[in-house]
């Protein structure tokens, strides 16, 4: 079974990845204006996120505008929104569950097997949360690539990957790896290791009585 150090490492990785997912969901830099071809814009930079689009001037001032209509958004953007929100909610739930089952905490009672199962459940929830975020970021990234190579879209309104999508990929990987380490807390190994089959020794010949 995984020791408390391995559990703590997995929880720390998953927590760090979840914080990254929160950051990438909130910031608007999922797409950034492309400078490919003749599209050379030095006066301003345009960004698009899950909730708003922003324009940054050369002076450093940024102005953002929230999306007015949900129905006017693309299906990929709406799906990415939903998956990221689900990922964050599952990650928060996984943190609570994993904390109850970790060896270094007093929550969840003193039953080691029960705590190991709780920690393993938290790790599985972390993995599901990371996969949801990974699918969301990959789907959104695929849409960016598709639009970039679409000849019907003018060059001056094409976008490239923004920093947020890379943060999302990195955060997803950390959450999945951290959840995998927590899932190594399999209670079966410990229960088998804690029980030893008693050995039977043959009786010594000296104990026999001779007439």
UniProtKB/Swiss-Prot annotation:
What would be one Gene Ontology cellular-component term for the protein?
basolateral plasma membrane
Induction remark: By androgens.
Tell me the Gene Ontology biological-process terms attached to this UniProt entry.
bicellular tight junction assembly; calcium-independent cell-cell adhesion via plasma membrane cell-adhesion molecules; cell adhesion
What tissues harbor this protein?
Expressed in kidney, lung and prostate. Isoform 1 seems to be predominant, except in some normal prostate samples, where isoform 2 is the major form. Down-regulated in breast cancers, including ductal carcinoma in situ (DCIS), lobular carcinoma in situ (LCIS) and invasive ductal carcinoma (IDC) (at protein level), as well as in several cancer cell lines. Loss of expression correlates with histological grade, occurring predominantly in high-grade lesions.
> Topological domain, Cytoplasmic: which ranges?
1-7, 103-117, 182-211
Q: Which family does it belong to?
A: Belongs to the claudin family.
**Subunit structure, per the record?**
Directly interacts with TJP1/ZO-1, TJP2/ZO-2 and TJP3/ZO-3. The phosphorylated form interacts with EPCAM. Does not interact with CD81.
| Protein's name according to its UniProt entry | Claudin-7
């Amino acid at each position: 079974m995984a020791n408390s150090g391995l559990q703590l490492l997995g929880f720390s990785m998953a927590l760090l990845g979840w914080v990254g997912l929160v950051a990438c969901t909130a910031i608007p830099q999922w797409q950034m204006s492309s400078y490919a071809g003749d599209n050379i814009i030095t006066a301003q930079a345009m960004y698009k996120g899950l909730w708003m689009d922003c324009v940054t001037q050369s002076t450093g001032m940024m102005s953002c505008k929230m999306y007015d209509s949900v129905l006017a958004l693309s299906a990929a953007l709406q799906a990415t929104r939903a998956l990221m929100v689900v990922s964050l909610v599952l990650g928060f739930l996984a943190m609570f569950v994993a904390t109850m089952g970790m060896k270094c905490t007093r929550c969840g009672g003193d039953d080691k097997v029960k705590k190991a199962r709780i920690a393993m459940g938290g790790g599985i929830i972390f993995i599901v949360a990371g996969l949801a975020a990974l699918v969301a970021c990959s789907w959104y990234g695929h849409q960016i690539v598709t639009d970039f190579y679409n000849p019907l879209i003018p060059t001056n309104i094409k976008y490239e990957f923004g920093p947020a999508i890379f943060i999302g990929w990195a955060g997803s990987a950390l959450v999945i790896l951290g959840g995998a380490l927590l899932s190594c807390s399999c209670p079966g190994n410990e229960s088998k290791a804690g029980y030893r089959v008693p050995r039977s020794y043959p009786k010594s010949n000296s104990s026999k009585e001779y007439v």
